[in-house]
C-alpha cells in the first residue's frame, strides 16, 4: 500500500515516475540494459543526459547566459564548492542567514574567507522571518551574497529577490526549486540537491552565470571546479547516472503537469489548506511570519507537546508518514513537495482535526 510521505528529503516522488522507472529497470527502451549498467559516455545514456539538461533549462527558462551543471555532493558540498569557485582574489562573502541551512553555509565559508553576516532572520522564537532587502548591510566588496531561499528546517521562504547589480547573488534552492517559476537571470548561481523536488539523492544541480566561471581558487578540486565541469558537459568524471535518469523523468512529469506555473498553483492550494488549519486552531502553532511561510516545508507545534508521540503514532496508523520535526527544532513538519498530492494534504488536515477533537 502506498502511503502519504511528508519526508523533507529524500522525499516523495511522483508515482508515474516510479512506475516508469520500474517498467524500464531491466530494459531501457529496447537496449537490453538497465540505466544503472550503461556507460556514461554511451549513446543511450548520452540521450538521457542531454534530454534532462534540456528539459531543466526549459522548465526554469534558463537564459543563454547561464550554464546548467550536474555535480555530486549535495547542498552541503556546495557550501564549500561555492566559495572555492567564486572568491577569486576577494576575501569576503556576504550571507543573509534565515535558518539552519544558511547558517551552515556561513559557517563553512569561514574555511575559505571572512564571511560577513549581512542580515539575520533569527528572533527570540528562532528563525521566523526573512529580512527585507532594506535591512541588509552588505560589505564594501563581497565576492558574492549568499542566501537560502527556502529553509527546509525552519520553514522560511524568501520570495522577494533584490537586484544586486554587479555583485553575484548565490541561492541555495534545494528545497523549492521547480515548485514555482523563478527569474534565473537575477542570480549568479543557483544550486540544489535533487532529493526534494528534482528526484532521488545523488545528483546536485548547479546553474551558474557563464562569466563567473573564471574565479576558482587554485585549491578547488578539478571535479568541483565549475569551469572544468562545464567544459566537459557535466561528464568530467562518472556522473550519478541513475539519479540523472530519475531527474529527467521528473522533468518530463512536470512538463506534463503544465509546467511550473501550474505546479505553483497546486502548491499554493496545498500550503493554504494546511496553514489555514494550523491558524484556525489553538491546538497547533506555526511561528513563522505569514508573508514568508514556506510552501514546501510546514513546521508546526502542538500546544501540548507531551502528545507529540501520540500524534505521530496516530498519523502513521493512517498512512501519514515522516511528520516528525527536525531534531534541532522539534515539533512536527510536513514537507509538501510537488509530488505530494492535494489528497495527501487533505488527509493530513482531516487527521489533525480529528486528533485535536480527541484531545479536547
From Swiss-Prot:
Catalysed reactions, as listed in the record: O-phospho-L-serine + 2-oxoglutarate = 3-phosphooxypyruvate + L-glutamate; 4-(phosphooxy)-L-threonine + 2-oxoglutarate = (R)-3-hydroxy-2-oxo-4-phosphooxybutanoate + L-glutamate
SUPFAM superfamilies for the chain: PLP-dependent transferases (SSF53383)
InterPro entries given in the database record: Aminotrans_V_dom (IPR000192), Aminotrans_V_PyrdxlP_BS (IPR020578), Pser_aminoTfrase (IPR022278), PyrdxlP-dep_Trfase (IPR015424), PyrdxlP-dep_Trfase_major (IPR015421), PyrdxlP-dep_Trfase_small (IPR015422)
Species, as recorded: Burkholderia multivorans (strain ATCC 17616 / 249)
Subunit organization: Homodimer.
Functional summary from the UniProt entry: Catalyzes the reversible conversion of 3-phosphohydroxypyruvate to phosphoserine and of 3-hydroxy-2-oxo-4-phosphonooxybutanoate to phosphohydroxythreonine.
Gene it is expressed from: serC
The protein's name: Phosphoserine aminotransferase
Modified positions (N6-(pyridoxal phosphate)lysine) in chain numbering: 196
Taxonomic superkingdom: Bacteria
Compartments (UniProt record): Cytoplasm
EC assignment: 2.6.1.52
Annotated family: Belongs to the class-V pyridoxal-phosphate-dependent aminotransferase family. SerC subfamily.
Keyword Signal attributed: no
Keywords: Amino-acid biosynthesis, Aminotransferase, Cytoplasm, Pyridoxal phosphate, Pyridoxine biosynthesis, Serine biosynthesis, Transferase
Note on cofactor: Binds 1 pyridoxal phosphate per subunit.
Positions annotated to bind pyridoxal 5'-phosphate: 101, 152, 172, 195, 237-238
An example Gene Ontology molecular-function term: pyridoxal phosphate binding
GO biological process: L-serine biosynthetic process; pyridoxine biosynthetic process
Cofactor(s) listed in the protein's UniProt record: pyridoxal 5'-phosphate
Annotated disulfide bonds: none
Pathway note: Amino-acid biosynthesis; L-serine biosynthesis; L-serine from 3-phospho-D-glycerate: step 2/3; Cofactor biosynthesis; pyridoxine 5'-phosphate biosynthesis; pyridoxine 5'-phosphate from D-erythrose 4-phosphate: step 3/5
Pfam assignment, any one: Aminotran_5
Binding residues for L-glutamate: 41
Amino acid at each position: 500500500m502506498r502511503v502519504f510521505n511528508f519526508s523533507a528529503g529524500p522525499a516523495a516522488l511522483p508515482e508515474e515516475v516510479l512506475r516508469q522507472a520500474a517498467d524500464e529497470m531491466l530494459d531501457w527502451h529496447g537496449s537490453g540494459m538497465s540505466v544503472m549498467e550503461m556507460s556514461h559516455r554511451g549513446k543511450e545514456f548520452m540521450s538521457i543526459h542531454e534530454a534532462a539538461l534540456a528539459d531543466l533549462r526549459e522548465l526554469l527558462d534558463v537564459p543563454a547566459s547561464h550554464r546548467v551543471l550536474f555535480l555530486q555532493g549535495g547542498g552541503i558540498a556546495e557550501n564549500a564548492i561555492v566559495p572555492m569557485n567564486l572568491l577569486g582574489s576577494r576575501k569576503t562573502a556576504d550571507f543573509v542567514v534565515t535558518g539552519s541551512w544558511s547558517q551552515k553555509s556561513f559557517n563553512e565559508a569561514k574555511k575559505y574567507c571572512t564571511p560577513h553576516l549581512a542580515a539575520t532572520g533569527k528572533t527570540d522564537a528562532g528563525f521566523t522571518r526573512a529580512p527585507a532587502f532594506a535591512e541588509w548591510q552588505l560589505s564594501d566588496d563581497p565576492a558574492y551574497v549568499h542566501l537560502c531561499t527556502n529553509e527546509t528546517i525552519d520553514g522560511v521562504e524568501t520570495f522577494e529577490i533584490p537586484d544586486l547589480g554587479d555583485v553575484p547573488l548565490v541561492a541555495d534552492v534545494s528545497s523549492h526549486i521547480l515548485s514555482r517559476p523563478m527569474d534565473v537571470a537575477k542570480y549568479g548561481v543557483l544550486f540544489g540537491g535533487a532529493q526534494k523536488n528534482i528526484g532521488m539523492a545523488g545528483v546536485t544541480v548547479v546553474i551558474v552565470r557563464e562569466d563567473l566561471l573564471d574565479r576558482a581558487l587554485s585549491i578547488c578540486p578539478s571535479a568541483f571546479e565549475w569551469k572544468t565541469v562545464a567544459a566537459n558537459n557535466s561528464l568530467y568524471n562518472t556522473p550519478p547516472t541513475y539519479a540523472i535518469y530519475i531527474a529527467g523523468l521528473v522533468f518530463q512529469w512536470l512538463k506534463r503537469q503544465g509546467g511550473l506555473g501550474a505546479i505553483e498553483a497546486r502548491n499554493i492550494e496545498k500550503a493554504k489548506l494546511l496553514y489555514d488549519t494550523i491558524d484556525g486552531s489553538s491546538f497547533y502553532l506555526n511561528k513563522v511570519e505569514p508573508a514568508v511561510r514556506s510552501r514546501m516545508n510546514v513546521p508546526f507545534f502542538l500546544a501540548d507537546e507531551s502528545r507529540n508521540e501520540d500524534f505521530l503514532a496516530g498519523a502513521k496508523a493512517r498512512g501519514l508518514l515522516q511528520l516528525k520535526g527536525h531534531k534541532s527544532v522539534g515539533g512536527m513538519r510536513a514537507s509538501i513537495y510537488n509530488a505530494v498530492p492535494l489528497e495527501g494534504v487533505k488527509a493530513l488536515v482531516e487527521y489533525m482535526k480529528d486528533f485535536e477533537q480527541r484531545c479536547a
